[in-house]
UniProtKB/Swiss-Prot annotation:
CDD domains: MPP_YbbF-LpxH (cd07398). The keyword Lipid biosynthesis applies. Binds 2 Mn(2+) ions per subunit in a binuclear metal center. This is UDP-2,3-diacylglucosamine hydrolase. It comes from the Bacteria. GO terms for molecular function: manganese ion binding; UDP-2,3-diacylglucosamine hydrolase activity.
Length: 250
């Protein structure tokens, strides 16, 4: 049996082919799995569980089918969908996990994160993250009208694109990649803090398997891929793990 781990699907009505691929993935792989973990950014935008969305409705119904059949489903919020709450979780049949958290995968304690916590060189993003994850901010934000929340979300996305463009203009390609990737010292500190030898995260859209030494211990950091040009899934079982690509329909 296998545990499946994915992230960064960024499901959006403007990219129906990715939703189609995700639903096919559920049909073909999840029904026989030990568990499915979604480590954030399942959706491109999420402004509250009361947000009308045909894509979200379709996804919830599909996930619920497998939850009802006995497959454990877990969701860790990402930077795009950290407002996914208890109402949607109940509809979809998944359990919301804290970021970060440690789970046991076939006897191996494994640290799961979305991944943005490790990108501390991007100071502006970390400040925005701290502001928007504050419980008081969230509570106040969710009292606003849907139109007001949508306007804030659109403005935040424009600001994010402008920030990324600014970083590209102000830095050469090597420095830009460094700023927008994880900070090695933070990775090492996270391993040491949680006392594990394996970490799995998404966010950076740079799928890879990294081997490193932390305090003389051999550690593994797995980076999940995004679902833009293809799908990406990490398959974990008692024998190890494999990163696989999924071809888009058509």
């Amino acid at each position: 049996m296998t545990t499946l781990i994915i992230s960064d699907l960024h499901l959006d009505p403007l990219r129906p082919v990715v939703t189609e691929l995700f639903l096919r993935f559920l049909r073909e792989q999840v029904s026989g799995a030990d568990a499915l973990y979604i480590l954030g950014d399942l959706f491109e935008v999420w402004i509250g569980d009361d947000m009308p969305s045909e894509v979200a409705d379709m996804v919830a119904a599909a996930l619920r089918t497998y939850a009802d059949a006995g497959t454990p489903l877990y969701f860790m919020p990402g930077n795009r969908d950290f407002l996914v709450g208890a109402d949607y979780a109940a509809r979809a049949g998944f359990r919301i996990l804290p970021d970060p958290c440690v789970v046991d995968l076939y006897g191996e304690p494994t640290l799961l994160l979305h991944g943005d916590l490790l990108c501390t060189d991007d100071i502006a993003y970390q400040a925005f993250r701290a502001q928007t994850r504050d419980p008081e901010f969230i509570a106040q934000f969710l009292t606003q009208t849907l139109s007001a929340r949508l306007a804030f979300s659109q403005q935040a996305r424009l600001a994010s694109h402008a920030h990324q463009s600014g970083l590209k203009q102000e830095n050469d390609s090597t420095q830009f990649e460094k700023i927008t990737d994880v900070v090695p010292a933070d990775v090492a500190a996270m391993f040491a803090c949680y006392g594990v030898n394996r970490m799995i995260h998404g966010h950076t859209h740079r799928p890879a398997l990294h081997m490193l030494q932390v305090a003389e211990c051999a550690c593994t950091r797995v980076v999940l891929g995004d679902w833009y040009q293809q799908g990406s899934v990490l398959c974990v079982d008692a024998d190890g793990l494999v990163l696989e690509q999924l071809l888009l329909p058509g």
